[in-house]
Amino acid sequence: MMKKIISVLLALAVLLTLFASCGGRQDKYADSLRIGTTALPKNLNPYSSTASSSTFFVSLFYDTILGSDATPVGYEEGVTYTFPDGSVYTPVDTAKNPLSFTDGLLEAAGALPKEEGSLYGYEYFDPTEEQWAEQCKRESIQFGIDETGNEIVETEEEFMARALIAVPKTNWMRFRFKVVDGHSWNDGTPFTAEDIKFSLDYIIKHAGSFGSQAYFLTDYYSSEVVDGDLVFTLASNNYTSMKAICNSIVILPKHIWETIRNPAKEKNLSPVGTGAYYIAEGDYIEDSTITATLRSDYDAALLAKMFAGDPIQNISVILMSNEDVLINALREGSIDLMMDSVKPSKAYAVANNSAYDAVEICAVNSDFVTTLLFNVGPYGAFRDGGFNGYSEEIRQAISLCLDQELLISEVLHGMGVEVGDCLVQDYYAHAYVDENGEYVYHKTDVDAANALLDTTSYKMDANGSRGIDLTVFATPDNEVTVKAIASQLHKIGITIHYDQATSTYADDIKQQNHADFDMIINSVTFTADKLMMYSARYGVYPNDGGVRLFNYSGIVDETLIEMISEMELAADTAEQYALCREVQKYIADLYIELPLFAENTITFYTSQKWDGWVEVEGSSIWNSYSIRYLHEIGA
């Protein structure tokens, strides 16, 4: 009997301990904005970890050189848009500020043309022979040696021709920026322009570890600190590359990272940053929770810019086992936001189930365009001369047959937008337009597609087949897309087969591996603000004509290469954008990459505890506006 009593008492003690633990955990999150995720980061290194959960925390702890204006969903030009606090949205004047920069660690005026009498802004200059030669060396452009280090035979004229493609000799850009007052590191160390210079040079020094960051600095030449200001030199006039440099690279504290010799292995679990939040001791609990706390020493003026009312004191990110657990936690109100983005099928299921009425869905336009890309390389079925010489006609017929509206309905449950054959979405100011100034959408005409194929040697037989069997290489996530494409192409007598790829299939289709796929489901992020992406996706290496890293199609088109080069070397941004439209049109007419749709970015949240969420074009519900206007209900 006594043993039974002791057992019961022990069980009760365990239960009380568990309840106390849960209660303590709930109390800890009581004043927090609670965010659920299926993956907590084990690494907060802002340069080596690209997991979405890591990126989320990096945005809390670190700042970029400049900010960027964001357009709230629902804003229409000429119509007043009012934020939750009654303030009015004023868009950036893109005629003066084409990349929509705002202040960050530095003042945005430094990224605009220098006005007479001002120290700040940019100006053009021609580099010295020494500067030009130094940049060529950085780009591995050397006489008699190709980019891979192999010796080649070339004349001075041939060397100069390929060198000038990589490094122009005229119209470099020099910027001067003023540091924004108030920023400091969360360990109390003052922030200076030296930290920015250090960060940029550190990335270049460790380019092998920070490849994606180093890619943003392709045109970077040097920076220096002059009287407390940052003077930054771009080894080209490719102004649009400043978008990635200023908005994508977070700045590290020199006094911390200059002692780190192997940065790729640095987990950085107690980050020292200029952001408004930090991780207090004991608030990083591996495989459980990470809580970010508002800095008590954060500058009052910067805090007022960040928050319209009382600031969010704590942000707790809580690990949960799977997507469905997260969604139910939102429904019950035990978390406020789901960090993970979801597929349209999941959003459709939630939207059509009344049990989840408390779960709100944010589905907004994204920069990503899903495409069907043909292999026109030397080992691809669509190479020159392929299909009895009818490769282009077949590609064009497939383009005409594809119905984007139907794909968006069937694959995305309506949660996406159409895209023009230029691969750039219509809401970008510099997307391709026709002679009337109207955006050119993708054209669907099945009859015209069949008529075009009837001019080839591939005639339709009694069974409705033309004997054209093609394979689409795609990841499991895109299997439903392939099946939808197959259903549409059946109308023109083309049979499509699905070939499953791994999530890292990009490594398998690079041209140096002699890719022999027919087609792949690809994703591109073409926007007019990312002109440098065109060269990466359609360019070739100057010395041997080998295709560049992301040129999965294998295309080698001298006209396109010249057009891209002319665009990148244009004298000013307005001319670059004008030439960009011509490049877009030329790419559309090649029929080597066909747009399917632009899938919405979809996130779930709830307003049961926190209200003031603001949706932003091209972003999730977690953005600077939501941070600014969120307030605890009843507080």
Model-predicted segments: where are they?
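Gly/Pro-rich hinge or "lid" segments in bacterial periplasmic/extracellular proteins
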Residues: C246-N314, D324, D447, A451, ...
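N-terminal lobe/hinge region of extracytoplasmic solute-binding protein
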Residues: G36-V167, V272
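A structural "hinge/loop" feature
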Residues: T37-D63, E76-G86, T94-N97, T102, ...
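Detector for C-terminal structural segments
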Residues: S49-F57, T289, A397-D434, D477-A486, ...
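Alpha-helical secondary-structure segments
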Residues: R34, T192-D201, D229-V231, A276, ...
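Append "and occasionally in soluble cytosolic enzymes with long acidic Gly/Pro-rich linkers
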Residues: V88-T90, A95-P98, T102-E123, K137-R138, ...
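Surface-exposed binding/hinge segments that line
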Residues: R176-K178, K197, S212-R261, K265, ...
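Ligand-site clamp/hinge motif
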Residues: V179, K265, A300-A349, T495
